[in-house]
From Swiss-Prot:
SUPFAM superfamilies: Ammonium transporter. One of its GO terms (biological process) is ammonium transmembrane transport. This is Ammonium transporter Rh type C-like 2. One of its GO terms (molecular function) is ammonium channel activity. The gene is rhcgl2. GO terms for cellular component: apical plasma membrane; membrane; plasma membrane. At larval stages, expressed only in the yolk sac and gill. However, the kidney and the gills are major sites of expression in adults. It holds the Pfam family Ammonium_transp. Residues 1-21, 95-98, 161-162, 215-232, 286-298, 342-356, 431-488 are cytoplasmic.
Length: 488
């Protein structure tokens, strides 16, 4: 008992948020390590190497257009924007944590993609010289890997230090690479848009970490855990970037041709359907019928998450609309009822509500994928279609649809186990009092880790100041209180 109380005392001692030594040390050591590891293990693949000229001759390729770069780069651009702009700005809704949202998103993405290229490379076939060969598709997969860690970041937004985020990313990338290898190469499950591999794993990884790092006195900073008018507008920019580019995300690594084309169409339709049901439920469950910006920023994206696994399947346009329809309802109701329940009953403090945007839709996506695979038939897919979709990579074996459906369900279980188990372990590591995390009363505040300009929240932005003659006098005070002053 004495040891238990002693350990608890260590974890509960006063916080030291000075990261002047720890953050530079981690960044420098990590980057130097990456330079060494890339020098030893990583080389360009044949399509990025100067020997591409000879490769073309050997394979009777007549044009550089056949280089995979020209097929994949447009999708890579879109995915890259989603990672750095979409995810970053989506998390700027907190009134005093925009620097941390965008800046730390930038940091852990740049930190993680390098480690992802190595980890995913080690779990893929190596070149004849024993080196990891990287090309444009590897860059896309590295961005996918980083996306899982950015999803996890949403659960602990404003409550952890940048050093903790880097450690969380290091472990998250490693777990992701193993989980991805098991799901895609051992089980040979299909998950084009990553409903299971990316969203389910990333969300439950972050939620498990948040549960272990539970802060019983977080209400000391509740006045900072909210938005103001302009922070919600910035977050909506992130939503729109994600919404527009999600078809590229779900189709980026599909096979060229009909599969990639179908994945973009299915995602496009699911996203559109989700918007309408999100707006409907948000208005329906608000007493005055007004819309909640939290729902519009987040739940409108749930359809893109849920259609990911089945994106390249013959889901049919109406099927995509159905998936989006139900995901908009489930995700919005999750924000209204489930998020408070998770915090009050299960002690999971989910800052961004990733359980509603990524976890539940990710699980739904896994289930939709399993059902769609099991229901596949020759009448719908044709003989060659079934072979292209369900053939085991590297062999001529094609599974029966019902068997493939079982493997899809098993893959969902793997993602859940890695997310929950890995997140619990990493949460215990992050609970050690050496990472410089903020005290309860200083959460959700950029001033802990950033040089912040003088407070300007009381100043009305120039556009509104210019137009304030259009606002009745009795509305001025209300506008200042609701939109530009911190709520106590």
């Amino acid at each position: 008992m004495g040891n238990c109380f002693g350990s608890r005392g260590i974890c509960d001692r006063p916080k030291n948020t000075n990261i002047r030594l720890s953050l530079p040390a981690v960044c420098f050591v990590w980057q130097v390590s990456m330079i060494i590891l890339f020098g030893v293990f990583v080389r360009y693949n044949e399509e990025a190497d100067t020997n591409w000229v000879y490769t073309k001759k050997e394979k009777n390729i007549t044009s550089d257009i056949e280089n995979d770069f020209y097929f994949r780069y447009p999708s890579f651009q879109d995915v890259h924007v989603m990672i750095f702009v979409g995810f970053g700005f989506l998390m700027t809704f907190l009134k005093r944590y925009s620097f941390g949202a965008v800046g730390f998103n930038f940091l852990i993405a740049a930190f993680g993609l390098q480690w992802a290229l190595l980890m995913q490379g080690w779990f893929s076939p190596l070149g004849d010289d024993g080196k990891i060969k990287i090309g444009i598709e590897n860059l896309i997969n590295a961005d996918f890997c980083v996306a899982s860690c950015l999803i996890a970041y949403g659960a602990v937004l404003g409550k952890v230090s940048p050093v903790q985020l880097l450690v969380m990313t290091l472990f998250g990338i490693t777990l992701y690479a193993v989980e991805e290898f098991i799901i895609l190469r051992v089980l040979n499950a299909k998950d084009a848009g990553g409903s299971m591999v990316i969203h389910t794993f990333g969300a439950y990884y972050g939620l498990s970490i948040s549960r272990v790092l539970y802060r019983p006195n977080l209400n000391k900073s509740k006045h900072m855990n909210g938005s103001v008018y302009h922070s919600d507008v910035f977050a909506m920019i992130g939503t729109l970037f994600l919404w527009m580019f999600w078809p590229s995300f779900n189709s980026a690594i599909c096979n060229h041709g009909d599969g990639q084309h179908r994945a973009a169409i299915n995602t496009y339709l699911a996203l559109a359907s989700t918007v309408l049901t999100t707006v409907a439920i948000s208005s329906m469950f608000e007493k005055t019928g007004k819309l909640d910006m939290v729902h519009i920023q987040n739940s409108t994206l749930a359809g893109g998450v849920a259609v990911g696994t089945a994106a390249e399947f013959m889901l049919m346009p109406y099927g995509s609309l159905i998936v989006g329809f139900f995901c908009g309802i489930i995700s919005t109701l999750g924000y209204i009822y489930l998020t408070p329940f998770l915090e009050e009953r299960l002690k999971i403090q989910d800052t961004c509500g990733i359980h509603n945007l990524h976890a539940m839709p990710g699980v739904i996506g896994g289930i939709v994928g399993a059902i769609s695979a099991a229901a596949a038939s020759k009448e719908v897919y044709g003989d060659l279609g079934l072979k292209n979709i369900f053939s085991i990579e590297g062999s001529n074996v094609t599974r029966l649809p019902t068997v493939q459906g079982g493997y899809q369900a098993a893959a969902l279980c793997v993602a859940l186990c890695f997310g929950i188990g890995g997140g619990t372990f990493v949460g215990l590591v992050l609970k050690l009092p050496i990472w410089g995390d903020p005290a309860d009363e200083h959460c959700f505040n950029d001033e802990m880790y950033w040089e912040v300009p003088e407070d300007e929240e009381s100043i009305i932005p120039p556009v509104l100041s210019y137009n304030n003659h259009m606002i009745p006098n009795n509305k001025h005070e209300e506008m200042r209180e609701t939109n530009f002053a911190e709520q106590s």
